Structure formats: C-alpha cells, structure tokens
C-alpha cells in the first residue's frame, strides 16, 4: 500500500478532532487529509479526498456514526476505526459497528486516562487498518443486511439437532465417519485411512471455498494429519483479536445449540466491551453465550467469553472443569485476556480432547498455547488469509506448522461440528 496513510477524522467535537489530528500528524507514516463534523460531511469528504482510513465518532448531529458507517460500506468501502464512549450504551453501539464492517475501535480517553496509551493504540490501529485490503471490507447488500447465512436459524431453540448444521443426520455422520476410525454419531464405521492420501504431517489442508463438498473433503483429507485414534473433543477454544467480533458472530451463529462440547473464547478488548459482545452473540446464536465468571463450569452448548482485564484460566476439579479468573497468568504476555494463557490451560486440562481455533487478529498471541495443544495431541484450525481482516495470529500458527486445517471463515463452523461429532 502507499504511505503515508491518508486519514479523515470525523467528530462533532472540535476538541476531539484536534486531539486525534495532532496525535496522527505527529507520526510520519500518517497524513490527516481532512476532517468532518458529522456523517453527511464525512460521506462527501470520503468521496472527494479518498482517505484510506476514517476515524469515526459515534454520536454526531445530522447523521450519526452507525448510519454513516452503513452508508460508507454500502457505497464507498473504506477502513473505519470507531471512537467509542465508555458508557454501556456506547459499548453496545461499538459492537453493532463492528458487525456492520468497522475494522476496529478505540475508546475515547476519559479524565485520568493515559494519553500515551491512547496515542500508541490509535496510531497502531490506524496503520493496521490501512493494511486491510478493500476487498475484505463489508460492502453493498451483504453489509446492509450483515447476517451471514446460518446453517441453522438464529436461536431456534437450544435443543436444535446437531445434524441441522450440515442438513441431515446422514450428512453429519458422513463427515464424522471420514475423520477417524471408530463410530460416527450415526453409527457408521470410520474410513479415515481411505481418504487421507496426499496429506503429510506439517502440511495444513487448504480447501476450496464455499461448497459442502469442499468442507467435507477438506476435513476428511485432514484426517491424514490427525492422530489415528482420537478421544472425543470436549472443548473448543477460540482466540481472536482485530476483526474478531464479526468472525465470532459468523462462527457461533452457525453452531447448533446442543453442540456436544464446551466453548471458551478470548477476544482482545478493553474493559466494558466483552459483556456487551457476549450479550449480542447470545441474542444471535443458538448456543448460550455469556461473559465468563469465576467458578463457571464448562458444559456442552455453553460458550464463555473471557472478561476484559482478567486472565481466564481453566482448572479441573474432579470431573468438572471450572473457570478461574486471575490478575496474572504466570506467563509473559501483553494481553488481558490472553489467548496463550487460556490455551495453555486448555491443553493441560483437556489434552487430546481439545480443539484450538485461531481467528483473525494482529500479532502472535495464541502461538504458545496452540503449540501446547498440539503437543498434547489436540487439533488446530486456523482461519485463512483471504477471509482474515488481519492475518497475524493465524499466520503465526500456520507458519509454525501447527494448523491441521486452514479454512475460510465460512467453513470453520462446519469443520468444528464435524470434528466434535465425528471424533468418538
């Protein structure tokens, strides 16, 4: 891409416009090409100035942030970073903005907050957003509706059959039977050995996109890389960062409410935003989704999202595995919550019964945890580059040779179901 990054600052507050402009202009890799005081001005200036990134306020006269974002994505897609408030209402609006196509967000500094932290985050996020290809930004009809075609209807009832994910019990059994020896959920003998030709250890499977046949074929081919006799998967651990809320929505809304495995999730977010994200995902998914609390017990059909500002760790007590929330994780990490911190305890408590999923995000958080999962005999799925908003965390896993499957986002939920239900 071309440097410096051209940025349009959109905010009705003169103070906020000046603060953001001064911070960005101090970086030689960033050029503020203009500002707008409301959404209508923003649409006009995006068309005339052609910025690469827009910083967008939520509450403005004439046209608010969400309305502006929707119009931008439908007509003139550009990387958008939302400047959000710390209020509960502001957090809910931010979650909606991420669904509608915003690349990332940053809370406006409150009195007493460190301007150094805000400066660092703002410049880092602007540069990261500038690297996102325009083809990955939400656009047109897909953005206005912004509802991925689910394999099941949103919240049809938490007893929805697992077979609905792939269309029929026979289809689910067919996928599962091709993953490992033994019996599939439908009682058929597995045939993994017959379909594993061409797969070598250390080489991730990369299927074609979009068709059930491609998904089934990829998962079946992946059996050649997986241990021949795996115990049933009991936990799905998901880690993500930039682009994660939209990715989580697509994955979780395509899973059945009675998935026979618990789910634990780390999404890098500041305090005050993980709760609203969990509530929004719970509204949309057939699974039960909630922000994790200390003492929560993992169970099938429940997805627990790590709270911001804490490390979510797992501890086994007898037959139950519980959530432990800690200030520190006993490892060196920049993040709270940390994907590595969670995944390391997943590997410890579940071993070969664990499935690690790494989605879009900056950096390499999760790499140590995925390595531990693999060393304990677990399985790893990584999102592919073409569908990742930022191909950092998945890339680290793929380049380290840890990914059993490298899949486009829309194929990850079917693969999870196939692996979980076909591993018995």
UniProtKB/Swiss-Prot annotation:
UniProt xrefs under Pfam families: CheB_methylest, Response_reg
Post-translational modification remark: Phosphorylated by CheA. Phosphorylation of the N-terminal regulatory domain activates the methylesterase activity.
UniProt GO MF annotations: phosphorelay response regulator activity; protein-glutamate methylesterase activity; protein-glutamine glutaminase activity
InterPro entries noted in UniProt: CheB-like, CheB_C, CheY-like_superfamily, Sig_transdc_resp-reg_Me-estase, Sig_transdc_resp-reg_receiver
Keyword field: Chemotaxis, Cytoplasm, Hydrolase, Phosphoprotein
Catalytic function, reaction form: [protein]-L-glutamate 5-O-methyl ester + H2O = L-glutamyl-[protein] + methanol + H(+); L-glutaminyl-[protein] + H2O = L-glutamyl-[protein] + NH4(+)
Active-site residues from the entry: 241, 268, 365
UniProt-listed GO biological process terms: chemotaxis
4-aspartylphosphate found at: 57
GO CC term (a single one): cytoplasm
Function: Involved in chemotaxis. Part of a chemotaxis signal transduction system that modulates chemotaxis in response to various stimuli. Catalyzes the demethylation of specific methylglutamate residues introduced into the chemoreceptors (methyl-accepting chemotaxis proteins or MCP) by CheR. Also mediates the irreversible deamidation of specific glutamine residues to glutamic acid.
Protein name listed in UniProt: Protein-glutamate methylesterase/protein-glutamine glutaminase
Taxonomic lineage: Bacteria, Bacillati, Bacillota, Clostridia, Moorellales
């Amino acid at each position: 891409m071309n440097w410096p990054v051209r940025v349009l600052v959109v905010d009705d507050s003169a103070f906020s416009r000046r603060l953001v402009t001064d911070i960005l202009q101090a970086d030689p890799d960033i050029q503020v090409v203009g500002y707008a005081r409301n959404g209508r001005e923003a649409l006009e200036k995006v068309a005339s100035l052609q910025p690469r990134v827009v910083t967008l306020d939520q509450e403005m006269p004439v046209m608010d942030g969400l309305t502006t974002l929707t119009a931008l994505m439908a007509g003139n897609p550009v990387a958008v970073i939302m400047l959000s408030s710390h209020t509960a209402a502001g957090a809910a609006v931010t979650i909606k903005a991420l669904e509608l196509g915003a690349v990332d967000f940053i809370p406006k500094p409150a009195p007493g907050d460190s301007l150094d932290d805000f400066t660092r985050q703002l410049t880092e996020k602007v540069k990261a957003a500038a690297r996102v290809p325009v083809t990955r930004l939400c656009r047109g009809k897909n953005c206005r509706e912004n509802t991925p075609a689910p394999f099941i209807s949103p919240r049809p009832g938490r007893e929805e059959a697992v077979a609905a994910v792939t269309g029929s019990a026979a289809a689910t059994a067919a996928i599962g039977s091709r993953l490992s020896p033994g019996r599939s959920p439908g009682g058929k003998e597995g045939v993994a050995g017959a379909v594993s030709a061409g797969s070598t250890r250390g080489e991730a499977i990369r299927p074609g996109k979009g068709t059930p046949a491609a998904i089934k074929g990829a998962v079946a081919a992946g059996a050649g890389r997986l241990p021949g006799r795996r115990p049933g998967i009991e936990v799905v651990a998901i880690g993500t960062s930039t682009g994660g809320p939209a990715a989580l929505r697509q994955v979780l809304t395509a899973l059945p409410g009675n998935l026979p495995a618990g789910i634990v999730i780390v999404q890098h977010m500041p305090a005050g935003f993980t709760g609203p994200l969990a509530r929004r995902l719970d509204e949309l998914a057939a699974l039960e989704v909630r922000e994790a609390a200390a003492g929560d017990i993992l169970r099938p059909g429940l997805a627990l999202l790590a709270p911001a500002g804490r490390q979510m760790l797992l501890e086994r007590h007898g037959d139950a595995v519980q959530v432990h929330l800690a200030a520190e994780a006993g490892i060196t990490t920049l993040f709270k919550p940390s994907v590595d911190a969670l995944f390391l305890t997943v590997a410890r408590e579940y071993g070969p019964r664990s499935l690690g999923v790494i989605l879009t995000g900056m950096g390499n958080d999760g790499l140590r945890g995925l390595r531990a999962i693999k060393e304990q005999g677990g399985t790893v799925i990584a999102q592919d580059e073409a569908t990742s908003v930022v191909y950092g965390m998945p890339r680290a896993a793929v380049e380290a040779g840890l990914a059993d499957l490298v899949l486009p986002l829309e194929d990850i939920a079917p693969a999870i179901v196939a692996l979980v239900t076909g591993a018995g």
